[in-house]
Amino acid sequence: YSLSIYDSVLTSIPESAIACEAEFRLAEIQYRVMEDFDKALNLYKSSLSKCRSKTLKEQNILRIADVHLAKGDFISSIKFLDSSYSIHDIPEIKNKLIEMYLFSGLPDTALTMINNSFKTIIPTNKYFNDLMELRDFINHYYVKIDAEGKEVFKNYLRSESLLKQRKIFEANQLLEYIQNNNNNEIISPLISLRRSIILIRLKKYNEALSQLSTLNGSIYSDRGIIMSGQIYEQFYGDPSKALEYYMRIINDYSDSIFSEPIRYHLRKIKNNEKI
């Protein structure tokens, strides 16, 4: 129904500002829902060529890059963002370019761009914290580890790019391969956490629980415990078992950033039991 409405708008007023936005909305449906990347790409490009709104121009540019990534065409995505950034000096485009370099398996280039960004932005900039977190992430899992570990991290990035291409089964297979061939203890918890999330999406809950159990003693211990509780609560319908996991956060991980949200969630569960 939505598709027919947008198509009629495009037919009746092809050069109007309304048509520009309608094309963008239709492209969103093709990209996010229908997953027809070729049609979405054509619509985003058409909308971009008509738009006068800076906001809509930016949205189209970022989406065109996303669609190229979804198609696995990193080169086109990077070239397009590079040329767009030379015309539109917009931070969001540069940040998207950093993302594309990272997921195309070029963390060194992404890190160089991040470090260059810190030369021109101040701590109050709205992107400062995000860039800082990304820099720390790359430093921890790539810069500070050996050559073998660096290759493992690049394979992890490839699995992330597969997810962005909607290839969830292939991403899971790649992560499983990494686990079976990886001896780097630093990156192992990251791989297990990411694979557990994918296994939940694939409704393989027992396998996900097995992955989450390996996170004990790692920097992701609290997340593993919480996610295990969520599996029992949301998918197995076992709130009593879920409470056991949630109480471990309260008792053993009181300093966790998740402790207060878990306290609040526990109160909700107990209130629901009273009803």
Model-identified regions with their sequence ranges:
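Acidic, polar-rich low-complexity tracts and alpha-helical solenoid repeat scaffolds
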Residues: 1-275
